Amino acid sequence: STKQNPSENQQVEINISPVPVADSGFFLKVNTPKDESLADRKTITVSGKTTFDATVVVLTISTHEVVKPSRQGDFSTNITIDDGPNYIKIQAIAPNGEIQTVERVVSYTTEDF
């Protein structure tokens, strides 16, 4: 028979594929806030894009927000920041448990800039 076992075909495909098997296309892009930015308001918007089926978690020292992206993968949430530097961790968690993390530092100031 000239038929091949499907698992053998898959093994051959994996061996010759230029794309690593672990690359699921899962990503996280944060549009706002920019890293090391200054804010003159206590409330800032965290927004970006990821895969539509991910769960996005926005963490600061005082809060955590869980956000579901739109069908296009867009997400946005408002968080309250404290005086001085604020360390913000944005994580996208895929259904398979894969995690992408982006960190931002945003400083709150009442001074004109």
Where are the regions a protein language model picked out?
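Ser/Thr-rich low-complexity repeats and stalk/linker segments
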Residues: 1-113
